[in-house]
Amino acid sequence: MLSERDKSRGDIRLEYENRKKRLKQQSLAGRQYVDFTLVDSLGCERKISDYVGKSDLLFLDFWASWCGPCRAQEPQLVRLYQEYRSKGFEILGVSLDANRTSWLSVLRKKENHWTDLCIAKKEDDKRVRELYSINGIPYGILIDKSGKIANVVTAGWVHLEMLLKGYYKGRNEETK
């Protein structure tokens, strides 16, 4: 049985690890994205590089069929997509599902209109999680047209909405 002192040490270690992960996530901003391979619903391989640079902003939406919060936040993401797509915003869904059948089943029911892909192999899943410091989902990475990571979104899609408003407001002011 753990003493109160040992429990406290465990809490401190956990808090330390969480802070370390958050700092690593924050340090991704400004870096060039790292490419990785995914598969589409037909089993064809795709790469992130197939999508980067095609729009002003590309949002990588990391999710999974078993993730309740991911599914609960999807209507808000659909709304943001509808609002900002014509301005140059695109979404690429990246499923972390290990079970392709579960992914495809949920994909058929989703009401989004963006491309959804799935991690190709189990070893790719681990690599992607490490590369992008993913320790929970929903999780998002906003990539600009040049391929630089503009921001990491871990606090829900309200944070994404604030980023989009700021980005497009700034762009509108530049064109005046």
Indicate residue ranges for each PLM-predicted region.
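Oxidative protein folding and maturation machinery
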Residues: M1-R46
